[in-house]
Amino acid sequence: MSLIMLQSCSSSKLSVFSKSYSAEDLKIEKLDFDYLTIKSKIQFKETHKTTKATALIRMKKDSIIWFNLSGALGVQGVRAIITKDSVKIINRVEKKYYLYDFDEVSKEFKFPIDFNLIQSMIVGDMPKPLDNSNSIKKSGEQYIIKQNIENIRITNLVNLQTMKLVEVNVTEKETDNSLKLLYKDFKDVNGQGLPFSIFISLIHYNEFGELETQLTINHSRAEASDKPLRFPFSIPKKYEAQ
């Protein structure tokens, strides 16, 4: 009798975890905004080096990400504007500027990076949209969404109660380089949940082994609005291109 009950429970448990869901079954909460202003504390950590700064971030959804850094030696006076096709950075202390397309950014970080990925990292949305080609299953208190898109594999973890994204793991197939995103401390912004604590880990490999870059972002204030924001950015003629 005990054996039969055990087998019955195991069979029942297996069916719960093996059930698949469609994209229409999930109503994952996405941050809806026209313009967004965020003030954050950031910490950037590489091998043997940690940099801290305060960031003022302004965004126009799906179009512009602008930020200004202050408070730390080496990043004081750094301003950047990110659009769909480029990243522009000026350092007003060193009087230098940098212009990149996303192929160059991806090469620098040894991982495929685009505008949508950066935007999703800041607001806690899925980097790639959900569709019926994705594998969707439920495990414990989370939905597990697996995506296989061109040269990357993505695993998204969504909280069952809040329907908010809490973790993303992205792996580049060819190199095995990986990106991990963790979202915590969700707070209300215009009736929607925004993660105020974000941890980003980027791992790549070279001839010496594994190298990790970490970025921690802690928002202190966030405001969504339908009123246009300013994104001041200009490069003085006397600045040197790098």
Task: Please give the residue ranges for each predicted region.
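Short, solvent-exposed secondary-structure boundary motifs
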Residues: F44-K49, W66-L73, M121-L130, I144-E150, ...
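An acidic-aromatic
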Residues: I65-N116
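Hydrophobic, well-structured mid-protein blocks that either form specific transmembrane helices
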Residues: S106-K146
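Gly/Pro-enriched, hydrophobic low-complexity segments
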Residues: S135-Q242
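Start-of-domain marker
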Residues: S12-S86
